[in-house]
Design a protein with these regions (language model features):
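Alpha-helical transmembrane segments in multi-pass membrane proteins
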Residues: 36-114
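Membrane-helix interface "capping/anchor" motifs
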Residues: 57-72, 198-199, 203, 242-250
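Membrane-interface helix/loop boundary segments of multi-pass membrane proteins
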Residues: 126-130, 183-209, 243-247
């Protein structure tokens, strides 16, 4: 009975594909471009102007389209109004954490209680067992992270964009911040932005546009140098995995495995005698 209930909830969670027109991609792409300006370029004025233009254009096409793009815009706006950094002070974590809650919470609440279509969902228990390939991908993620993250973080010096910590409290704060941000990435870029976009666009278009947002945000956070060359494909794959598994827990698990390696690399990079297990 429980499994049947979970499967029913899973079917309900599938996003409704609304009537589409090829024009939908234009305002959607402008929203994605506004995220690039807001985060990667840190050009707030141009970003907000482009976002406004996208919503005006969307309103000319479809009422439902402008609502869904506006929900994404709310999240982008909430995050763009606070400093997006790796600062782990209590003050900054509270400010950025509040923005993260609003960026996910407002679109979810609007979808659930105002439009009442409940388009945004966070499916944790799907009732579907993971396939063998999905299970094997998890340890593969650790190996990929082990091979990639030390080379990227240390050789480029990008690790300096994160605070150097060596005391227990600092290490705990870094661990918490890294993991919370990883979970939020999946809640907003995949469960919110991608889900809303794919109601109006083919999956491949929605995926490309959310990956631009995902990559732009992490660039502002501190993933500079050649990070977009692996973050963009990672974002594409995460959305694809979510489409296949319909499981938030799975994509969060994948992300947190990468983040665990990132955390260890950061500790080692700032304290070279610690966790000396990496090749770079």
């Amino acid at each position: 009975v429980k499994q049947q209930s979970a499967q029913a909830q899973l079917r309900e969670a599938a996003p409704a594909h609304l009537p589409r027109t090829p024009l939908n991609v234009i305002p959607a792409a402008l929203v994605s471009a506004s995220g690039f300006l807001l985060f990667a370029r840190e050009d707030r004025v141009s970003g907000f102007l482009l976002l406004a233009a996208a919503l005006v254009l969307a309103a000319m096409i479809s009422r439902r389209l402008v609502i869904d793009l506006a929900l994404i815009g709310v999240g982008l706006t909430a995050m763009s109004l606070v400093p997006i950094t790796t600062d782990i002070s209590t003050e900054h974590m509270a400010v950025m954490g509040t923005a993260m809650i609003l960026a996910v919470g407002i679109p979810y609440a609007a979808s659930r209680f105002l439009t009442k279509d409940h388009a945004i969902r966070f499916p944790i228990r799907t009732g579907q067992p993971w396939t063998r390939a999905e299970k094997w991908y998890l340890p593969a993620v650790l190996l990929i992270g082990y091979a990639l993250m030390p080379v990227y973080m240390i050789r480029t010096g990008v690790y300096n964009n994160w605070p150097a910590v060596s005391d227990p409290e600092g290490i705990a704060r870094l661990f918490l911040g890294t993991n919370v941000l990883g979970i939020w990435d999946e809640l907003f870029f995949i469960c919110t932005a991608f889900t809303l976009l794919r109601r109006h666009l083919p999956d491949w278009q929605a995926n490309l546009l959310q990956a631009v947002l995902f990559t732009s945000f992490l660039w502002e956070l501190g993933f500079h140098s050649w990070a977009p060359f692996f973050i963009f494909p990672f974002a594409l794959l995460q959305a694809r995995l979510f489409t296949i598994t319909k499981s938030l827990s799975y994509i969060v698990g994948v992300h947190l495995l990468f983040d665990f390696v990132l955390f260890l690399v950061l500790i080692h990079a700032h304290n070279r005698e610690w966790i000396d297990i990496f090749l770079y």
